[in-house]
């Protein structure tokens, strides 16, 4: 039973896979047979279903929605596949109590305009912290900054908060390093975000050449890019800009973008929708890679509905799901170590495996009805709000709920409308099915999960105490056990799995990465001369 529950609750921080495959096959990382000097060149047209409204790393922060920002900007520090802090724009020293951080710019790091990155640029970028979360957890915690004659900045923090270092050393470029004058021009006080190509200056492997709002972002290789050469994994691995240029096209019509992919209008696409068989027939190559997102059910415990009032009703909905069967239907479920909502064995706890509403013995309907009776459920409608990209998963789940006599209505929304809808407290929704970001510890799961929909005075207190403890310490782990038990008792948030992303490409394209998603650093054409701008 525990093995099945562990599968249900599995969330793997990252998995480094490598395999070779033929066109039309599934691959999870490819090692090419092309010499290094022959890889450079060619153009890629990449189609995504998110529309870019700006070029600001503090605004366009989603790893999957705004792929281009991670190509342009880099945070001062980053994380490897195991969540360890690693050099990026800067090298560093961090004290054991994490109250003192020393940063210095790595030798040879330059901006896209060719100017050398100075430590003053890094500090200005950190202080900028325009995005709401870094604004809350970085700038206010900086007590003092001293820069010595050797270009070493010593940052002293007022107190420990795990989120402070999370945002300074993050795979998302929330704090993208930019020239000091740009950081000051687009300060928080200015209320402006970067939309001008001339001001979109970062340190990443590619630089912006053209931006058409809500249409496309084009970029070219940053010839002066200085990669970290140490053999780290994940986003800390060496990044190479092999391609001459890239254009990110944004097309929210999935059918049109799939047809365009088969016609050769695009070279790379995320997901195939209903066109997977056609993609394979067309000779396109499928890549699969674990992401840092997962699938999650988040109940609305604030609204005056039966879902909000009753933990038993929430448990009834989880009990109704036949997880063993669901795993068989949904092949994106990942087997691995770890339990909800921890990301690796370090934070594993058997609290979740002991929860009586995770049913694996086939008595799902009976168990659900017992919880429904305890909740006093009389068939009231429960509104389910979902992101349009999750229709397949939610169709399977809603069948279980209906079989158990739970009255579900589904509201399907595009991503932007979805976020806006559930963020407005006046809207009544029973639960939402979404993609949460998976970070490096229980404390960092999500402010929305832990301090908003999921909030109670008791959990707020525990969460605050966890945030002030060094993650992974003995006292942290003891407090985490308390919070995990409250999460089970409340059943307000249930992680279902870590998500596999699927990417489809022209068969001549090669991705080389170690713990990286198929971003276009480290990607190249086997025959670059055959892949110019269309």
What name fits each language-model region?
Residues 47-96, 104, 127, 201:
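N-terminal lobe/hinge region of extracytoplasmic solute-binding protein
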Residues 81-84, 172-245, 255:
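Gly/Pro-rich hinge or "lid" segments in bacterial periplasmic/extracellular proteins
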Residues 91-135, 148, 154-159, 307-309, ...:
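Aromatic- and charge-enriched surface segment that lines or borders ligand/interaction sites
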Residues 118-125, 152-154, 204-205, 242-244, ...:
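Alpha-helical secondary-structure segments
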Residues 137-186, 205-212:
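Surface-exposed binding/hinge segments that line
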Residues 206, 333-374:
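Structural transition elements
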Residues 212, 216-217, 318-350, 389-398, ...:
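Detector for C-terminal structural segments
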Residues 227-279, 407:
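Ligand-site clamp/hinge motif
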């Amino acid at each position: 039973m525990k093995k099945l529950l562990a599968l249900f609750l599995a969330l793997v921080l990252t998995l480094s896979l490598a395999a070779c495959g033929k066109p039309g096959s599934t691959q999870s990382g490819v090692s090419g047979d092309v010499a290094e000097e022959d890889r450079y060149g060619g153009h890629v047209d990449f189609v995504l279903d998110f529309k870019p409204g700006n070029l600001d790393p503090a605004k366009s922060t989603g790893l999957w929605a705004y792929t281009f920002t991670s190509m342009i900007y880099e945070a001062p520090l980053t994380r490897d596949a195991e969540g360890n802090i690693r050099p990026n724009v800067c090298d560093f020293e961090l004290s054991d109590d994490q109250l003192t951080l020393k940063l210095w710019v790595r030798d040879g790091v330059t901006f896209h305009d060719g100017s050398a990155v100075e430590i003053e640029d890094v500090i200005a970028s950190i202080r900028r912290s325009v995005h709401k979360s870094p604004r809350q957890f970085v700038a206010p915690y900086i007590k003092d900054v001293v820069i010595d004659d050797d270009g070493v900045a010593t940052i002293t923090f007022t107190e420990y908060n795990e989120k402070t270092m999370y945002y300074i050393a993050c795979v998302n470029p929330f704090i993208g390093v930019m020239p000091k004058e740009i950081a000051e021009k687009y300060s928080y006080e200015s209320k402006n975000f970067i939309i001008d190509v001339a001001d979109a200056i970062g340190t990443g492997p590619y630089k912006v050449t053209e931006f058409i709002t809500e249409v496309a972002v084009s970029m070219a290789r940053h010839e002066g890019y200085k990669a970290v050469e140490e053999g780290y994994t994940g986003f800390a691995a060496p990044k190479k800009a092999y391609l001459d240029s890239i254009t990110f096209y944004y097309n929210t019509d999935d059918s049109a973008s799939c047809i365009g992919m088969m016609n050769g209008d695009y070279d790379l696409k995320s997901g195939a929708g209903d066109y997977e068989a056609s993609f394979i027939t067309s000779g396109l190559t499928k890549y699969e890679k674990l992401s840092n997102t997962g699938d999650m059910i988040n109940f609305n415990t604030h609204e005056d509905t039966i879902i909000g009032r009753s933990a038993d009703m929430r448990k009834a909905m989880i009990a109704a799901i036949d997880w063993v069967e669901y795993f068989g239907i949904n092949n994106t479920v990942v087997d691995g170590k770890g339990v909800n909502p921890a990301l690796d064995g370090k934070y594993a706890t058997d609290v979740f495996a002991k929860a009586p509403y995770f049913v694996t013995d086939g008595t799902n309907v009976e168990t659900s009805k017992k919880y429904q009776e305890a909740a006093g459920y009389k068939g009231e409608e429960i509104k389910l709000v979902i992101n349009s990209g999750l229709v397949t998963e939610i169709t399977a789940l809603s069948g279980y709920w209906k079989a158990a006599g739970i009255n579900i209505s589904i509201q399907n929304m595009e991503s932007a409308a979805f976020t806006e809808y559930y963020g407005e407290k006046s809207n009544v929704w029973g639960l939402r099915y979404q993609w949460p970001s998976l970070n490096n510890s229980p404390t960092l799961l999500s402010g929305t999960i832990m301090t908003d929909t999921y909030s109670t005075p008791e959990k707020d207190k525990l969460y605050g105490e966890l945030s002030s403890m060094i993650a992974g310490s003995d006292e942290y782990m003891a407090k985490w056990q308390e919070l995990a038990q409250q999460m089970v008792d409340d059943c307000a948030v249930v992680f279902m799995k870590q998500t596999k992303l699927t990417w489809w490409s022209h068969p001549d394209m090669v991705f080389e990465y170690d713990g990286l998603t198929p971003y276009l650093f480290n990607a190249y054409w086997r025959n670059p001369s055959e892949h110019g701008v269309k």
